[in-house]
Regions:
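Domain-level signature for proteins that mediate thiol-based redox and metal-cofactor handling
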Residues: 1-116
Length: 116
């Protein structure tokens, strides 16, 4: 059973959609279950001003994408390293280790966007 925190982000993600004027975007797939995540960011002076996502995947992947975008906003490129699977899992009410790949895809998409 999913937590209320996860279901809330799954049913009503705040940061889903396109980001006009994005400065970079990254994409990552999850070969285990087929999730595909794209995260677009807008940077200004080394700070992530906005982040938006488009995810085709499970409830965990969508909720994690939304939370990762929220946490990334206001952070520096080097500061986002504090966002990890354990932190996301805890914030979403505890995700079993078998499903952490659903968190890894949006994290990798963010890193891909930051590497460009």
């Amino acid at each position: 059973m999913y937590s209320e925190a996860l279901l809330s982000r799954f049913y009503e993600p705040v940061r889903a959609g396109d980001l006009s004027g994005s400065t970079s975007s990254g994409k990552q797939g999850n070969p285990t279950c087929g999730d595909v995540v794209e995260i677009a960011i807008r940077m200004n002076d080394g700070i992530i001003q906005q982040a938006r996502f488009r995810t085709l995947g499970c409830a965990i992947a969508i909720a994690a994408s939304d939370l990762i975008c929220e946490l990334a906003e206001g952070m520096t490129v080097t500061g986002v390293h504090v966002i990890d699977a354990a932190k996301i899992s805890e914030a979403l009410g505890g995700i079993t280790a078998e499903r952490w790949q659903c968190i890894a895809a949006p994290l990798a998409a963010l890193q891909d966007a930051l590497s460009k």
